[in-house]
Amino acid sequence: MRSSAWALSLACLLALVLTGCTLNTTAAPTAEAGAAISGIVHGGQNPIIGAHVYLFAANAGVFTPNTNGYGNASVSLLTAGTGRTQDTTPSDPTYLDYYVTTDSNGNFSITGDYSCTAGQQVYLYALGGNPGLGTGTNPAAGLMAALGNCPGGTSAFATGTPFVFMNEVSTVAAAYAFAGFATDAVHVSSSGTPAAKLGIANAFVNAQVLQTSGVANAAIPPLTAGSGGGDAPQAEVNTLGNILAACVNSNGTGSACTTLFANAESGGTTGNPPADTATAAINIAHNPVAAVGTLYGLSMANAQFSPTLMGQPNDFTMSIYYDNSLFNDFGALAIDANDDVWFATDYVFKLNGQGYDLTGYNGYSGFNNPYNIAIDVNGNAWALNSSAVGKFSNSGTLLSPTNGYNGLGLSTPVSIAMDASSNAWIGNYGGGNVVKVSSTGTLSGTFTGSGLSAPGPVAIDSSGDAWIADESSGAIVKLSNAGVAQSGSTGYTAAVLSTPTGIAIDHSGNVWVSNSGGTNGSVVEISSTGGLVSSSTGYTNSALGNPGAIAIDGAGNAWVADPNTISEISPTGTFLSGSTGFTVSNGYNSIGIDGSGDVVLNYDVYNFQYTNPFYYMQVMVGAATPVVTPVSLAAKNNTLGTTP
C-alpha cells in the first residue's frame, strides 16, 4: 500500500509536466486547505522512533534585484494543534516551528488542518529520534522528502492521503533536486518571480524522478507514446544514501558523523559544518569534488542500500540520461522561458526538463535538416540549416516559409543568437560574414568588420552588441547592433586564442571564449571593452582538452563542455570542478542551464552491439545555480548570468 499510494502521487506529478510548464504572470496565489499526509521515517532499514517531522514550503520571497530572496528561511506550515509540538530550543534551526513525532514504528501522521499557497513547493524534514539504539537519540539525523506542489485543493495530492517514505535515499533525491535553491535543510527559497516558481517546481519533480517510496529509481519509463525513457543514477543515489546512513544509524557523536560533517561543510572541507545529515547532503551536492574518497569510504562501512557504485567516483555530480528513439542526431540545444529544451536534429524537437517529448512523433516539421537553434524573447525558435534559417512558434507552427529565410549568400551558417528585438544574428561561415535577420524575416548585412573572415560562435550582450569568434584568425569581433565593427581592424586577441569554439557573456558584460587550439584547451575571459580579464593564456587545467560550447549560470560561473568532461569555472577563474573536471559521457556539442539549476547536455554514444549511435539528453541535476532563460530574454533585461 505504501508504494502504490506514493506511486499514484508521482504519476500525477509527472502527468503535470508531460505537457510542459508554462509561465503564468496573471494568476494570483490563493491559499488552499492542506491535505492529510502520513508516512514513515527510516534510518537505513530501521524505523526512527521519536523523530520530529516538520512540514516546510520553499520560501518565495519578495523580489529584490540581485538578491532575489535566495537564502531565506523555509516557511513552516504546521501550527498549534492536536498532536503537534513547538520547538522551544533557541539554538535549534527549527526554533518555534511545530512538528509531529514518529511513533514506535517510525510512523507519523499530519492532519489536513494547515494551509499552503497554490504553487508552493512543499517538503518534509525529520530531525533526531532513535534509529535503533538501545537508549538515547541521534540529534544529527536529518532526513527529507520532497512532496512538490502544495498538497491540497486541486493539486496532485488532493485525490488521497499520500504515504511518504522518508529515508536517506529520499534525502539525497531532495538535496540534489533543489540544491540550486537551498542553503541548508531549513533554508530553501527563491525570488517568487514566475520564472523562479517554475524553476523550483521543476526541481521538485526531479526528486520524484530520482526515487520512489525511498527506493532509488533505475529507469525512467516512458509515460506517453513517443516520450523518451531513460536511466536514473540508482547506484550513485544509493551510495550517497549509504554515506548518510553511516551517521544516521548512530548516536551522532562517532567517527561516521564527525568524518561526514568535516568533509561536507558549506564549502566542501571549509566553511560552516552541517548540523545534520540532510544539510550534509545539500553541501555534497554543492561541492561534488570535495573529499570524494573520504566520503565514499563511509559508504562501505555498513551499506543499507544497493546496488551501489562499483568503485570510487571522480565526483558526486548526479545525472539523469533521457533517451529518445525519435532523434536521428543531436544538434545544438536551446532552453526557453518554460525551461523546455529545444533540439535541432534534422527536425526541430522540444522536450521538457524531464525528457518527455512535447512535439509528437516527427517533431516540428516544415523546415528540413536544421542543426543549430536559438530562442527569441517571444519564445519562438529559430533553426539553422545549411542555407537558411527557419522560425517556429513556441507551439511548433512554422512561421517562416518552408525553405526558411535565405539570401545574402547564406552558406554553411554555423551559429545563431537572438537580440532584444528578436533579430537573428547568424555566423555565416561559408560566406565569411555575419548576416542579420529581422523578426519578420528581412535579411541585412553582410557584416565583415574587424577582419572577420570565418565566423564561428555568436553571442549578444545586454547592450545589443554582437560578439563573434573568428575560427580562422582566433580574434573576437564586436559589432554594434547596426553591424558596425567596435573592435578595431583585427578584433580582440589573446596569445592563446587560435581556434575559438564557444562563446558566452556574463552579467558584467565579460565575454567567455572556449579555445580548442594549442597543446591544451583554454577559456579566455575578455572585458566588454576588449581587455583581457584572464591572463593571455586563459584559464587552463588538465580537464580542458578540446573545450567547446559554454554557458553561464546564475552565479556567473562558466560551464564548459569537453568531449569527456564538464568544467565549471568561477568568475575569478577558479576551477570549481577540480583538476579533472566533472566526468560525463562523450560526444557533447551543446550545453545549457535552466531555471532549476540543471545543466543540460546532448550527447551521442556508439554501442559496439549496434551500428547506429544512441542519442541522449543528459541532465546534471541541481549542479548549477538557476539562471534566467532564454539567453535572449536575459540579454534584453540585463539579467545575463543571474538567478530568476
Where are these regions (language model features)?
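C-terminal motif of bacterial Sec signal peptides marking the signal peptidase cleavage site
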Residues: V17-G20
